[in-house]
């Protein structure tokens, strides 16, 4: 009897051990599935066309763009110049900014009209912004809200978190109006942060006459702030600092870096410091940032594997993976070359983003068309080095495959576009009254593709442009679904030497499990 109890006790202990191992395996699998994923539930991204639909009747069909007859379901921005001329960097050797008055009309439950009580009323500096876009007829505006004493006026705008710096983007070459909106919002669901964006309609007022400027987006500019790029504030008494950098054209008006990659011709274009500001950054802090970037670049462009494999000590790998996937999916050929941001917190690693400037994405680049059956982003600075690592390539493709089941699926993208176009409604036609002649211009160069076929990308109607976006995304995604890994893995030089610690633990538990099973059966 005593022996039977002992046998039962031993058997129970063995079963308990097996159960413990099985639970451990389940936990390992769950944790493994979570690794590399970014939880954005707390970000609560607002999509204007979904979340800000007003309970109004269907009277927003008027095409009247006079101040007396105008009404819209979108917010209205009035730029009161009091007769001053808005300028750009091309118009003066000094500071092109002038101070104007800005009103934003954004009624909660009715259409918005000129003369309604403004939700926001502020002084603001303004200038024309952009590079090539400075030459377009429809201008873009950089705004900085100010108090009467000249200090920053940090204000909530159209439901976006309070800030002082804003961009009014007119997207003259984007005949669809929607490329930036789609890319920013979907990136905002995937990455830690992407600029929030709202559609609005804009009027210029010179003190006497209101002039309709068309359909715009109000966008959060990229700056250090709690609800934007949330890095530690710069302390001028310290050499080390958080920073925000941008890859773009060389500019004498910005603080440029002479980092290892640039000086040695390993990367394209130039890196400039966006934060800390030129007015505050010390020479010592500038040198610190330059050295910090150079140290990372020496690692990824090293021919020594022992050095190269330490790159994960310097960067937030997941952010680089997401940045690769988003820009490749949307065919943003300018990313990695221009308007390419990265940031680093004082206590963190170098992080890619936020995303910016998708006017030329989705087969809208002026000098070349999107090649559906090719991967372009693999040649971008820094990324052309990272894809030497098999593990990085596998992370990129795994993340892409994961997102193709949700935010990057054909079904999600098509429905998103259709609902957005429906939401914009008559605002598209009002804008067309002023800027519709863009459809008559050959704005996109019809270059010969690698098959010798010349494809005319200049469409005649808005509806054709929307279909062109969908088709470009579908074709490119179809290629990536089949060939993404094969395409980017062609330059792999380094295969992982060791399995991750998580996989080691899984193997250990599995091996232990089978040993115990064999032991129990022998008993």
PLM regions and their residue ranges:
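Middle-to-C-terminal accessory/interaction subdomains
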Residues: 28-39, 132, 273-337, 345-505, ...
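N-terminal module-boundary/linker segments of secreted carbohydrate-active enzymes
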Residues: 35-111, 116, 495-496
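Conserved oxyanion/phosphate-binding beta-strand-loop segments in alpha/beta enzyme cores
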Residues: 112-170, 288
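A conserved alpha-helical element in kinase catalytic cores
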Residues: 172-193
């Amino acid at each position: 009897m005593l022996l039977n109890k002992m046998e039962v006790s031993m058997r129970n202990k063995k079963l308990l051990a097996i159960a413990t191992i099985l639970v451990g395996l389940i936990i390992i699998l769950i944790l493994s599935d979570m690794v590399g994923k970014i939880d954005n539930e707390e970000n609560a991204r607002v999509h204007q066309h979904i979340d800000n639909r007003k309970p109004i009747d269907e009277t927003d069909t008027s095409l009247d763009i006079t101040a007396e007859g105008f009404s819209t379901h979108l917010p209205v921005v009035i730029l009161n110049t009091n007769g001053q001329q808005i300028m750009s960097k091309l118009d003066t050797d000094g500071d092109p900014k002038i101070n104007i008055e800005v009103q934003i009309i954004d009624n909660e439950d009715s259409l918005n009209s000129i003369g309604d009580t403004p939700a926001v009323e502020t002084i603001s500096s303004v200038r024309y912004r952009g590079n090539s876009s400075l030459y377009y007829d429809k201008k873009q505006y950089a705004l900085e809200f100010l108090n009467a004493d000249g200090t920053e006026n940090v204000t909530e705008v159209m439901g976006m978190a309070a800030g002082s710096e804003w961009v009014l983007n007119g997207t003259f070459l984007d005949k669809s109006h929607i490329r930036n909106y789609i890319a920013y919002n979907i990136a905002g669901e995937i990455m830690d942060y992407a600029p929030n964006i709202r559609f609005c309609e804009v009027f210029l007022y010179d003190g006497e006459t209101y002039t309709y400027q068309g359909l715009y987006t109000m966008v959060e500019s990229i700056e250090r702030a709690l609800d934007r790029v949330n890095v530690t504030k710069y302390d001028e008494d310290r050499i080390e600092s958080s920073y925000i950098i941008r890859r773009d054209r060389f500019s004498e008006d910005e603080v440029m870096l002479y980092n290892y990659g640039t000086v040695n011709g390993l990367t394209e274009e130039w890196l400039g410091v966006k934060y800390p500001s030129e007015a505050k950054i010390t020479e010592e802090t500038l040198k610190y940032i330059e050295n910090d970037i150079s140290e990372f670049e020496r690692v990824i462009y090293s021919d020594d594997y022992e050095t190269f494999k330490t790159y994960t000590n310097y960067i937030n790998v997941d952010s680089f993976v997401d940045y690769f996937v988003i820009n490749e999916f949307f065919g943003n050929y300018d990313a990695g070359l221009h308007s390419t941001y990265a940031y680093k917190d004082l206590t963190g690693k170098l992080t890619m983003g936020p995303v910016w400037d998708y006017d030329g994405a989705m087969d809208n680049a002026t000098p070349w068309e999107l090649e559906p059956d090719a991967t372009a982003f693999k040649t971008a600075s820094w990324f052309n080095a990272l894809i030497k690592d098999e593990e990085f390539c596998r992370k990129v493709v795994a993340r892409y495959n994961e997102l193709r089941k949700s935010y990057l699926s054909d079904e999600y993208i098509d429905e998103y576009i259709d609902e957005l176009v429906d939401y914009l409604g008559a605002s598209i036609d009002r804008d067309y009254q002023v800027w519709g002649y863009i459809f008559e211009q050959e704005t996109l160069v019809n270059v010969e593709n690698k098959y010798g076929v010349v494809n005319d990308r200049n469409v005649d109607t808005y509806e054709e442009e929307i279909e062109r976006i969908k088709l470009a995304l579908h074709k490119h995604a179809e290629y990536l679904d089949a060939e993404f890994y094969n395409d980017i893995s062609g330059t792999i030089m380094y295969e992982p030497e060791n399995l991750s610690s998580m996989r080691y633990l899984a193997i250990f538990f599995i091996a232990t499990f089978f040993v115990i099973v064999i032991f129990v059966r022998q008993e």
